[in-house]
A protein has these predicted regions:
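Double-stranded RNA-binding/processing signature
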Residues: 1-188
């Protein structure tokens, strides 16, 4: 797993790099610190943080890819990780309870909360209209961006089992905290 402790040192950076970080995205370095993951392929991070409205205003998908495809993959990665966790840790819970619990853990409201807790909204690249209409705090947009970020980590860390481990490293603490008393019985 590619984890790095992010330093607050700005030595060697120009004043523009202090705010934008090495990816050119405002807050990207802080975001990496918040999730405990440092991207090898910064283009994946950039794509994960790019809303379709920004892409449209900057030449479209071929020139400035947006996060929609990553969102698609991230949704599935998250579902598998949470499903495996519930299946392995709550062996006495019936399927219906596990399904209900997973639905609550990965619903728009929960994902928007996870996204807000890592400061994801502050890092998004939004088109002018989306920016003016409050897109940085819109739950549906935060949810989608969070799923895209998961996919970016998954792909950057090698996909497969390595990718799932990397994503689990920062997703599961939030999920476990939210899990609270949703399921009866104790986890194994």
């Amino acid at each position: 797993m590619k984890k790095k402790t992010v330093s607050n040192s700005n030595a060697g950076r120009t004043s523009g790099e202090n705010a934008r970080g090495s990816s050119g995205i405002t807050g990207a370095d802080a975001l990496e610190g918040n999730i405990g993951y440092r991207f090898s392929d910064r283009s994946l991070l950039t794509e994960a943080l790019t809303h379709s409205s920004y892409s449209y205003e900057h030449g479209g998908q071929k020139i400035c890819p947006c996060n929609e495809r990553l969102e698609f993959l991230g949704d599935s990665v998250l579902s598998v990780i949470v499903s495996e966790y519930l299946f392995e840790n709550y062996p006495d819970s019936p399927e219906g309870d596990l399904t209900r619990c997973r639905s609550e853990l990965v619903c728009e409201q929960a994902l928007a909360g996870y996204a807000a807790s890592i400061g994801l909204g502050d890092c998004l690249r939004l088109g002018r209209g989306e920016e003016k209409s409050g897109g940085r705090t819109r739950p549906s947009l935060l949810c989608d961006a969070y799923e895209a970020l998961l996919a970016a980590v998954y792909l950057d860390s090698g996909a497969g089992d390595a990718g799932k481990r990397a994503v689990s490293g920062y997703v599961m603490p939030s999920v476990i905290e939210r899990l609270g008393g949703m399921l009866t019985g104790r986890p194994v």
